[in-house]
């Protein structure tokens, strides 16, 4: 939005604000300062005005410094409408974080200004787009007294985080009861030494890796496509169809006789996910102004290219196991499903606290690790 402004244009954003507790406004200030610094502006505070009334603050940002005439008009309107001016080029904020963030003249200074023990006020990026999650994981281990100053916004974040942790626990319990217990009751199949362990590792890798690609990309493309519903629909459609196509094409691969596929396929997936990791950002920037249909087609092409070989892994793994015994196949189905369910929740947590790129790196690691059990299982 800032890039689209004329030199004398104005961007206005309003968020919740509380003078007694830190809130989303602090992160908004951090984002505005980062945007101004990226434009080569050395004094962000001269390009920003922050006003508030009751529990809402409004930030005004301009590519050019506010003139005396602009500031006179803002002060007159603020007095008439009973707004409090929290920051302007004429008046520094009394709140340390707001004051220091707008006084930063480098990214390093901004990072230092936004440090907090429990809250994350760093500017949200495309790789970490969770603007409203301002709680650090360290806050989960803190006492209520330590968190008392953080206010209702952080309190809501804390409740949401506990809900995510509860979801992880329920997913683990559900997977154990529905998949784990029946498999344990069926007994461990008799297999040559190391085959069963390699099988568990193989299907755990593809179950985890698949979800570590799917879940983060839904979030990454939500803004690009304009709505989370579009991202979910397009991502699920493209990945499921492409993975199904890959599963069908896997019949043409003689993995039992040609051991090279156990190396070539995982490496191909690693390269394609790495391409998404490196190129999705530049592609989004270059095509963000295209129509919705064009953007959907770009996402489908980008995702399907990696999903086709990803879809080959499951049927090829089953075929590798049939060389030893059909009795172990239910175990492999179960492990794949269990890790997929757990990884879908874990991917959200990783993306929130470490970034979408970290989730993709986990996926890359899973498919790279896949080489080990695949080679061991290939006769």
Question: Can you annotate each of these PLM segments?
Answer:
Residues 1-379:
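Alpha-helical transmembrane segments of multi-pass membrane proteins
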């Amino acid at each position: 939005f800032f890039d689209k402004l004329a030199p004398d244009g104005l961007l206005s954003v309003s968020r919740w604000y509380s003078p007694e507790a830190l809130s989303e406004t602090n992160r908004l200030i951090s984002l505005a300062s980062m945007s101004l610094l990226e434009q080569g502006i050395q004094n962000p505070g001269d390009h920003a005005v922050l006003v508030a009334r009751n529990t809402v603050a409004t930030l005004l940002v301009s590519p050019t410094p506010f003139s005396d005439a602009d500031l006179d008009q803002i002060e007159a309107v603020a007095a008439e409408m009973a707004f409090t001016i929290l920051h302007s080029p004429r008046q520094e904020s009394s709140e340390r974080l707001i004051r220091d963030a707008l006084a930063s003249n480098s990214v390093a200074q901004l990072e230092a200004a936004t440090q907090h023990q429990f809250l994350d006020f760093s500017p949200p990026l495309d790789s970490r787009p969770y603007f409203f999650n301002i709680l650090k994981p360290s806050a989960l281990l803190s006492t209520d007294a330590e968190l008392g100053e953080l206010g209702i916004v952080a309190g809501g974040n804390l409740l949401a985080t506990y809900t995510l942790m509860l979801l992880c626990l329920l997913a683990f319990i559900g997977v154990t009861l529905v998949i784990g217990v029946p498999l344990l009751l069926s007994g461990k199949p008799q297999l040559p030494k190391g085959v069963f362990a390699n099988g568990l590792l193989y299907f755990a890798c593809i179950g985890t890796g698949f979800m570590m690609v799917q879940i983060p990309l839904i979030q990454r493309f939500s803004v690009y496509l304009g709505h989370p519903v579009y991202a979910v629909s397009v991502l699920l459609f493209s990945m499921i169809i492409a993975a199904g196509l890959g599963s069908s094409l896997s019949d043409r691969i003689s993995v039992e006789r040609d051991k090279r596929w156990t190396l070539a396929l995982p490496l191909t997936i690693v390269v394609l996910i790495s391409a998404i990791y490196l190129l999705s950002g530049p592609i989004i920037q270059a095509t963000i102004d295209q129509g919705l249909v064009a953007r959907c087609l770009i996402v489908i092409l980008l995702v399907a290219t990696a999903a086709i070989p990803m879809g080959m892994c499951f049927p090829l793994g089953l075929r590798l196991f049939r060389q030893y015994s059909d009795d172990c196949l239910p175990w492999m189905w179960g492990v794949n499903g269990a890790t997929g369910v757990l990884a879908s929740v874990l991917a959200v947590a990783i993306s929130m606290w470490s970034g979408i790129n970290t989730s993709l790196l986990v996926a890359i690691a899973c498919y790279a690790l896949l080489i080990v059990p695949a080679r061991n299982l290939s006769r």
